[in-house]
């Protein structure tokens, strides 16, 4: 996914949920790299699974932060990249609970007025949750059902 920095991108494996920060440069290969943001798969497909596009990334108004959605289950993660320090790369759970099980994309997200809050929507049932990401720590990261 594209970031506001023309030399830095987030590469997403939409099949497993793994993602990397990719850096390009005109200064040569010493300044180019790809580093994992999260090392572990968020889903483990079998060879017969057809999960194309299962995971989706959404840019937030914060240039360093994306929301990753498992559109099959409703699970959410806050993904953060950094151009100054690789120690600041982050992929943390907003919602570990599997809200639905299935083999197709049924969830989407929509921003609210606050840059930190979104709606998670089950496009089949109409069920909705409100969730929040944060830079302040896990106590400020939450999700709640609203209907």
Model region roles, listed by residue range:
Residues 1-5, 11, 26-29:
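Ordered, small/hydrophobic-rich secondary-structure cores
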Residues 1-3, 46-60, 99-113:
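Beta-propeller blade-edge signature
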Residues 7-14, 64-72, 117-123:
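Short beta-strand motif characteristic of blades in beta-propeller domains
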Residues 15-19, 26-28, 73-76, 127:
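Primarily extracytoplasmic ectodomains and periplasmic/lumenal surface modules that are beta-strand-rich
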Residues 20, 42, 57-60, 65:
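A general "mature secreted/periplasmic domain" signal
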Residues 22-23, 79-80, 131-132:
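Tandem-repeat architecture and repeat-register "anchor" residues
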Residues 26-51, 82-103, 134-147:
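Trp- and S/T/G-rich repeat-edge/linker motifs of beta-rich repeat architectures
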Residues 125-135:
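Short, exposed beta-strand-loop hairpins at the edges of beta-sheets
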